[in-house]
UniProtKB/Swiss-Prot annotation:
It comes from Neisseria meningitidis serogroup C (strain 053442). Belongs to the pyridoxamine 5'-phosphate oxidase family. FMN binds at residues 60-65, 75-76, 81-82, 104, 139-140, 183, 193. Catalyzes the oxidation of either pyridoxine 5'-phosphate (PNP) or pyridoxamine 5'-phosphate (PMP) into pyridoxal 5'-phosphate (PLP). One of its GO terms (molecular function) is pyridoxamine phosphate oxidase activity. Binds 1 FMN per subunit. This is Pyridoxine/pyridoxamine 5'-phosphate oxidase. Keywords: Flavoprotein, FMN, Oxidoreductase, Pyridoxine biosynthesis. It catalyses: pyridoxamine 5'-phosphate + O2 + H2O = pyridoxal 5'-phosphate + H2O2 + NH4(+); pyridoxine 5'-phosphate + O2 = pyridoxal 5'-phosphate + H2O2. The lineage of its organism: Bacteria, Pseudomonadati, Pseudomonadota, Betaproteobacteria, Neisseriales. Homodimer. It is an enzyme of class 1 (oxidoreductase). Its cofactor is FMN. Pathway: Cofactor metabolism; pyridoxal 5'-phosphate salvage; pyridoxal 5'-phosphate from pyridoxamine 5'-phosphate: step 1/1; Cofactor metabolism; pyridoxal 5'-phosphate salvage; pyridoxal 5'-phosphate from pyridoxine 5'-phosphate: step 1/1.
Amino acid sequence: MDLHNIREDYSKRELSEGDCADNPIEQFERWLDEAVRAEVNEPTAVNVAAVDGRGRPNSRMVLLKEVNSEGFVFFTNYHSRKGRSLDAHPFAAMTFFWPELERQVRVEGRVERLAEKLSDEYFESRPYQSRLGAWASAQSEVIPNKAVLVAKAAAVGLKHPLHVPRPPHWGGYIVIPDLLEFWQGRPSRLHDRIQYRLLDGGWIRERLSP
């Protein structure tokens, strides 16, 4: 398959240092708000990359559930491949891509498990069927067929017809950033790249060559 001629020329917007907030979390919130208002498809979808105990990289898409002054929060099965990788090497890289705005954001940082109380609170807010699924799915494990999964979910529903407690193997992670990069597509591949680096407790903002 020849893909050489598939390309886009970006020209919608530009990003100058003067446009950027001093704090990268504030800058991210600005861009996320713009993505939501522009009705970008799945604006909170983010690729999370991690490295397992053998040094082998792996990545997947998850949904960002919170961003605050501490970092970026998402939830998953702790026994999944990504969960095992993050526990073995507690660092991650995240990439948001908003093609409608010709933008992407990269985040790198240390990863910690979220406090159990916070994981409990979010789990309680999930739809009933999603809570059943968290118990039924041994995420990333091989199963003989889909019927096994459906049967397990049904069994959990019979056991917990009203209230489904959070499984101990399911909860949140927070990525505590030490680097963020904001990328704005520009004509002739002369893209705008503004990077924030954490140094001695403060953020250094700098422009990168595209």
